[in-house]
Amino acid sequence: MRHTNRYLRTTVSAAVVGAAVFGFAGIAAAQEAPASVDDIIVTAQKREQSLQDVPIVVTTLSQEVLDGAGVQDIKDLQILTPGMTVTSTQSEASTTVRIRGAGTVGDNPGLESSVGVVIDGVYRSRNSVGFGDLGELSRIEVLKGPQGTLFGKNTSAGVINIITERPSFDPSVSAELTAGNYGAMGGSVSATGPLSDIIAGRIFVAHRERDGFYDVNVGDGPRTLTEDNTQDYWTGRGQLLILPSDEVSIRLIADYTKRDEFCCSAVQTRVGPTQAFIAALAAPNGPGQRPPVAGFGTVPFSRTAYSNRETPQEIEDMGLSAEATIDLPSLNATLTSQTSWRDWSFQQGMDLDYTGADILHRENDGSNGYGVDNLTQEFRLAGATDKFDWLVGLFATKEGVYRDDSYSYGADYNGFASFLLTATLPAAVGGPSPSRLGCFTNPQGFLVTAAAPNTPLCVVGAVAPSAAAPTFAAGKAYEDHYSQRSESVALFTNNTWRVTEAFDLNLGLRYTYDSKRLLGVQDNLGSNGAACGGALANQNPANRAPSAIPGTVNVGTPAAAVGLLCLPWSNPLYDNRRIQEKFSDTDISGTFKGSYRFNDAVMAYASYARGYKGAGYNMDRVQTGVTPDASLFFDAETVDSYELGVKTTLFNRSMLLNLTYFDQKFENFQLNTFLGTAFVVESIPELTSRGVDADMVWFTPVEGLMFQGGVTYTDAKYNDFTAADLSNPARFPALSLLPGARASFAPEWSLTGALAFDRSLGGGLRGGFNLSAKYSTDYNTGSDLLPYKDQEAFTVVNGRITIGSEDERWTIDVWGQNLLQEEYTQVGFAAPLQGTAFTNTTTPQANGTYYNIATDTATYNAYLGAPRTWGVTLKVKY
C-alpha cells in the first residue's frame, strides 16, 4: 500500500515521544520505552528536532505522562511544568496562563494572551478558548520565553503547543469510563482506522459531569441551587488523514464542545465592617456572608459560598482546520498550508456582590457574555541544504470579538447604598440606615444645620426623604454592546546556518501588521442614572432648590457620596454613549541564537529574542472620577529576552539535564487589574523577570522506573514608577504597591517532580504507579499586590496506580489529585462595594504607597484551588 512509508514517517516520532518523556506512566508507555533521551523529539521550531538540539527551554509531556499526573485540562498541566501558573476566576472563560511571572488576569475580552495556545498548528487567540478536554493527545510542548518569530504575536511569555493523535491506518477502538467523588462521572469513546486505501479517520467523543466543589448559602434567593463550580460538558473531534501520494498529506479536523455548568462562586477570606449591613439586608435568610471574626476570620476552605443569584455559564466552541503538506524533492523542501476557522461563545449569569443579599447581579438572559470568531491562514516553505535549514512563511488572520454586558440592581441595592452613605453616622441621628438614600439625591439639595454640618437634615429627622428623590429601581440598569474587528498579517523567516560541525547560528525575523476597530454602544435603561444626576445637580448651587426650612443650609451633596451614587453602572454620562476607535500598528520581532556542541553529550547556547503583544481596547465602563474615559485604548507590549543555556546527556544517554539562565524585560507590560468597578488594562512601564530553569529526565537502571523533575527560580519585579508614568495617573493610588515589588503570581521557587514505575507482574498482567508533585513558594494572587491576597507556600501531590493486561486490552487506574488536601487560593480579590483598601488616595504613606493595612476596610474573597478528588478509571482497547 502506497501510504505505508509516508504514514510511518509522520507517526513514529509521536509514538516515541509518547513513550519517552517522563517514562513509564502507563502500560503503553512501558512497551514503547526508548533506549535513550535522544529519542525525545519536539517541533518547537516547526520542524522535527531532538529536544537536546533545540536552543529553547522546552518541557515536553506525552499523553501517558498527562494521564499519569491526572491531567484532564490545561489547568492541571501546571503540576508538571515549573515556573507556570494557570488560574480561573469569574468563569471557566477567564482562564489565564503565566510563565516566569509574566501574564495577566483574563477577565477582559479586549486583552489578548501573553502565553499563546496552539492546537494542531492552529493559534487560539484567547487562553480561554484553548482549555477543555482535548481528547487523545500525542504530546504537549511548553515553550518558555518569547516565541513570536514562529508562533506570532501574543506569545511574549511563551507557548503551549498541543499536538493531538492523528488518524491511523491500523484500526482500533477504545473506550474509557471514570467515576469519582463529588459525583464525578465521565466517559469517552474513540475509533480510528482506514476508510480507503488513502484515507484514514479518527473520531473521539467524551462526556463528563461532576457536582460542585462549593456549598452555597442562597440567602434572599431567588437562587435555589445549593452547590457551585459544577462540571457538565460534551466534546467531540473528528479527523481525516488523506495521503493521495507519497509527496502529499492532508489532515482535516472538526471539533465541537458544549459546556453547561454553574461557575464560579468565591468564598470570603476576610470580612470587613459592611458585613453588618449585608446581614441586616439578608435577614431572616441567613447572615448573607461569613460572619466576621478577628484577623482573617474562619478558614474559608469549608468551601461555603454566599450567592442569592444563580451563576450559570454556557460555553460553545467549534472549529474546522485543514493542514496540507507537499514535499518538493527538487528543492529538498516542504510546503505547508494551515487553514482554520473557529467560533467560540460564552454566556453567564453572575452574583456580582458574592453575598446572600440581593444587591447587584448579571442576568442569565443572553445580555452577558462574549464571543470570538476568527479565520486564519498560514503558509510555510521549509527546506535544508548541507549548511542551512531555512524557513519562510506568511500568516494572516481576521478576527471578531463581541461583548454584551449588563448589570441589574437587586431589591437590596437601595438599602445597601443608603447603609454605606450613612455608615459613619451615630444611631442618635438616624444612621446607619437603609432608608435614607433620598437625603443625598433630593432635588431640594443637601440640607444641613449649623449644629450638624456633616449630617443631612432628613437623617436627623426634621425632614423625611422626599418621595420625589430618585433612587435605584430594582431591575436591569444598563446594557452595553461592543464589537471589535481586527486584521493581522505577518511575514516571517527562521534560518539555521551550520557554521562548523559543532557551531550553529540561528536568525529569525517577523514583520507584523496589526489593525483593530472598536465599535460600542453604552446605554442606561429606564430611570437608571437619575440618582447620580440628582447628586451631581445638588453640587451646583444654581441647581439647588431653595429651602423654606429655617436654620438650614444647602451645601450640596458631598463628593464622597457622589462617588458612590455615580459608579459606572449608575452614571448618566454613559447613557446612549457611542464608541468608535481604531488603530493600526507594525512591529518587527525576531531571535538570534548561537549554539555550540562540545561533544555528543554537551551543547551550550546563547540567545536573544524579541516578543510583541498587540495593543487593544478595554471593553468595559471605565471612568476617572465620574467622567467616562475618552478612549479605551491601551498600548502594545514588547519584551526583550536573553538566555544562556546548557543541555547535557549523561550516564550512557539515560539522563537529560538542562540548565538555562534567563533575563527578560517587558515594556508597557499590560496589567489587567480590577478597580472595584471594572477590569482595566494599565500599561506598567517595565517588568523584569530573571532566573534559572532546570529540567531533568532520568531512565534509571531499575527496570521500569523513571524520574522527571524541574526547578525554576524567578525574580520577577516591577520597576520603580510614578503616577506620571501611567496612561491614567489617577490609577496610581490603587497600583502604588507595585513599584519595585515582586510581580503577582511569580513564586520565587517552583519545583516539580514525577516518579513513574511500570513492569510485568506475570500471568499476562502489568502494573505500575505514578506520583507527581509541585511545590511553589509564596506569592501574591492579586494584580494590586494587597497583602490580604497573599498565598503561602504550598505543595500539590497527585498519584495513580495502574493494573492491566500485557496486551493493553484493559487497564484499571485508581487515582487521586491533591492527595494531601492542600488548601490554596487561585486568585484573591476585594468584594465590590464592601469597604475599601485605599481610604486615602490624596496623601501617600511614608513609604510612598497609598495603602495602610490598619485602615483597610475591604471584604476579601477568593477563588480556591480544587480540593482532593479521587476515583477509578477503566479503559478498554481493541
What are these regions (language model features)?
Residues 1-69, 75-81, 246, 320, ...:
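N-terminal Sec signal peptide and the immediately downstream disordered periplasmic leader
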Residues 37-170, 644:
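Acidic, small-polar-rich N-terminal luminal/periplasmic segments of exported/outer-membrane proteins
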Residues 95, 112-114, 126, 135-144, ...:
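Outer-membrane beta-barrel translocator/receptor signature
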Residues 161, 168-170, 178, 192-290, ...:
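Periplasmic-side early beta-strands and strand-to-turn transitions of outer-membrane beta-barrels
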Residues 210, 321-325, 334-352, 597-620, ...:
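Membrane-embedded beta-barrel scaffold of Gram-negative outer-membrane proteins
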Residues 241-245, 381-382, 393-397, 482-664:
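Structural signature of Gram-negative outer-membrane beta-barrels, strongest in the C-terminal barrel
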Residues 389, 501-505, 654-666, 683-783, ...:
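Gram-negative outer-membrane beta-barrel transporters
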Residues 400-401, 407-414, 706, 774-782, ...:
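C-terminal beta-signal and adjacent terminal beta-strands/loops
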